[in-house]
A protein has these predicted regions:
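Proteins synthesized as precursors that undergo proteolytic processing into mature forms
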Residues: 1-153
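Cofactor-centric catalytic regions
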Residues: 135-186
Length: 186
């Protein structure tokens, strides 16, 4: 499984950390009290495609597999100081979840909790995916009329967001998983 956490301390130092052992319980191998991952499944085990071209994500010594993990820290363009931290679990849809949350905060004016809870959507180029039960029939029909296949599916993000509003930090935890927001006064 994959987890994400966002943290800010009293000095404004920010962390966005996404960690994964791939599938539930990873490789199911315990070493020194922790589970080893099975991230090798992120590689393409075929070195060449049907046309004989090398696949970029093929297994090679010293190489890391491609990943969709996208822990994100947003910096204020004027001061260069961190003003937001966010990320999510969710496999190949992580980038969609983070992009949706950033757009929700910056352009739709949502607060951190609203952005984390907003309906999920994404595209692979061949299909458009909408979070099941979150988009009405006219919206789905309008998207389908534009060409790509539209599929309603479960999109269980787990987005965690911290964003600075004035001199305070606001948090949001995705209700689709067991995330939470906590604050401590020094």
């Amino acid at each position: 499984g994959t987890s994400h956490l966002s943290v800010v301390d009293s000095r404004g130092h920010v962390v966005a950390m996404t960690s994964s052992i791939e599938t539930a319980f990873g490789s199911k191998q315990w070493v020194a009290g922790f589970l080893l991952n099975n991230q090798l499944t992120d590689f393409s085990f075929r070195p060449r495609d049907a046309q004989g071209r090398l696949i970029a994500n093929r297994v090679q010594p010293g190489k890391r597999p491609r990943s969709s993990m996208a822990p994100t820290v947003v910096l204020d363009p004027s001061s260069g100081k961190p003003i937001a931290s966010l990320g999510s679990p969710g496999g190949s849809f992580i980038i969609h979840y983070v992009a949706k949350s950033l757009w929700s905060l910056a352009h739709w004016g949502l607060d951190a909790q609203q952005a984390a809870a907003a309906p999920n959507f994404g595209t692979t180029g061949k299909a458009t995916f909408l979070e099941r039960g979150r988009f009405d029939a006219p919206t789905q029909a309008s998207l389908a009329a534009r060409g790509p296949t539209v599929r309603a599916v479960d999109l269980t993000s787990g987005t965690q967001i911290l964003i600075q509003r004035g001199d305070q930090w606001e948090g949001g935890a995705d209700p689709r998983r067991e995330g939470l927001v906590m604050g401590v006064q020094p």
